[in-house]
Amino acid sequence: YTHVLVGPASVSLLKMKFPKRAHEVATEFGYPMYAEGLRRALDFLAPLGVPIEITENGVADANDTLRTEHLKRHLWVLSQAIQDGHDVRSYHHWSLMDNFEWAEGYSMRFGLHHVDFETQERTLRPSGAVYKHIIEQH
């Protein structure tokens, strides 16, 4: 969930730039971290009266420096929305482990587990331990 600032330019959709505001933190993908976008999406969908499942919410972060904050912000916004009556049935972080991204190949690291693509060894990242703790408590 992010927002897009637009202006005149001639670019391919796959090579779009996502400018950030001065107070925003950008992910390695170039998207601003925007937890409020999750709440706005839930508020927009609420009138439909259908159960919601969040199936992909994550951040490209090879060094795992942003993912914990991303998780905390988004899960806090999600918990507030649920307390306010939104019928959210599930949340699935993107992704359990680093994987192949269709447009970016193996260059973007979304996983709660680091994957060494040469050996296939998987290692839990600190953000994965934080997520584990959060879901154990709730």
Regions found by a protein language model. Give the residues of each.
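Non-catalytic scaffold segments within catalytic domains of secreted glycoside hydrolases
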Residues: 1-138
